[in-house]
């Protein structure tokens, strides 16, 4: 066993016969009020943190897109959580890695995450090579071993997923959100071995003490980054990730049968007997993702190729294709409509990617945040890729 390896027994309990409380509170009277209410229903803040204790916060910041797009966790919610933990005398630390097709530094800078953490009294955890530990997953069906951040093995975790659909997994809520605590090697393996079973295996290993699903603005359609924003105005919380996720599915109008990793989790861990408290969950039917079989096969194949491509090139294969503008959701300037007004340049966090003289986008520099699409008054910037040619408006 290597210096960065350890064996770990599964900590996921069998939940059959246990009553799991799931709380849903509307945010229309303020996110702070909703946050305090859900936590109070679950036993209060002292149930989840103690003075002097380090608490790992795991938001969903999968890509450089703001929370009002439905793609990422609200920074307002994250800041409030940091504040509450600081008030208890705890030490909140933020841990997140983006999707493999996005560069870590660019994503962090898009959210100004280092400054955000510092200004709110939290620590942004480094993700250097010595921060990862290889762990054996006892009982793992397909994912037998995972490289996870050392902090999640040493401290309690509060999980902050987003209420949204996902073109590969159907939905991404609490259980899926834990992929962000994994090294890219493990993320790749999960896609190659089978994403749904792998998510279940990862949740055998890592069990947050609290799951807070951010449903202020959700996402429907071809999520989890470039779907359609959907205003919901709800926080859903539970100590049990599966119970919280099933409540999220209920709100989204999605059956557990449509989300294989949650179905498998129910079979493995038992479907929790839930006690629902707070505001009534009124079904708000989300548009389902619509991937073709060819898309799903191609997406998985990307990760198979990446296992050889990345060691040779030092860049992930899907990121390489996106940077070349070969695949992926991306902005496109319609030369017949563009009037070179410059509004896109003013809002773009990477303006060097826009060439208004030639009306082109340099995808090697583009973050694919699509801020330019919203800023373009004449609607000259379109969206190309699997999400279809459409506007964000």
Task: Label every PLM stretch briefly.
Residues 2-335, 339-341, 345-358, 363, ...:
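N-terminal and secondary-structure boundary signal
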Residues 366, 370:
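Cysteine-rich micro-motifs
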């Amino acid at each position: 066993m290597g210096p960065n390896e350890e064996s770990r027994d599964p900590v996921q309990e069998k939940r059959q016969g246990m009553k799991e409380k799931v709380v849903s509170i509307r945010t229309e009277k303020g996110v702070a009020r909703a946050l305090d209410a859900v936590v109070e229903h679950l036993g209060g803040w002292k149930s989840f943190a103690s003075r002097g204790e380090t608490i790992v916060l795991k938001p969903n910041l999968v890509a450089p897109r703001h929370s009002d797009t439905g793609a990422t966790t609200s920074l307002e919610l994250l800041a409030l959580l940091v504040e509450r933990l600081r008030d208890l005398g705890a030490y909140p630390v933020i841990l997140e890695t983006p999707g493999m097709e996005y560069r870590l530094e660019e994503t962090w800078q898009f959210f100004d995450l280092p400054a955000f953490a510092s200004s709110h009294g939290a620590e942004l955890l480094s993700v250097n090579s010595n921060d990862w530990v290889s762990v054996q997953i006892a009982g793992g069906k397909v994912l037998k071993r995972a490289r996870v951040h050392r902090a999640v093995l040493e401290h309690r975790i509060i999980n902050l997923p987003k209420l949204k659909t996902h073109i590969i997994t159907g939905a991404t809520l609490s259980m899926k959100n834990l992929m962000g605590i994994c090294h890219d090697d493990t993320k790749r393996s999960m896609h190659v071995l089978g994403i749904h079973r792998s998510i279940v295996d990862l949740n055998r290993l890592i069990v947050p003490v609290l799951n807070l699903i951010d449903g202020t603005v959700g996402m429907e359609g071809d999520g989890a980054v470039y779907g359609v924003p959907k205003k919901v105005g709800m926080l859903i919380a539970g100590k049990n990730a599966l119970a919280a996720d099933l409540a999220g599915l209920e709100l989204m109008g999605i059956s557990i049968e449509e989300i294989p990793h949650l179905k498998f989790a129910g079979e493995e861990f038992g479907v929790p007997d839930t006690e629902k408290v707070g505001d009534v969950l009124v079904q708000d039917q989300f548009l389902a993702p619509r991937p073709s079989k060819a898309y799903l096969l191609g997406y998985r194949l990307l990760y198979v190729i990446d296992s050889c491509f990345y060691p040779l090139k030092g860049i992930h294969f899907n990121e390489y294709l996106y940077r070349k503008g070969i695949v992926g959701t991306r902005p496109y300037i319609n030369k017949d409509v563009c009037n070179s007004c410059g509004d896109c340049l003013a809002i773009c966090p990477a303006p060097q990617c826009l060439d208004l003289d030639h009306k082109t986008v340099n995808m090697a520099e583009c973050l694919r945040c699509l801020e330019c699409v919203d800023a373009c008054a004449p609607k000259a910037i379109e969206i190309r890729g699997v999400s279809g040619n459409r506007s964000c408006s």
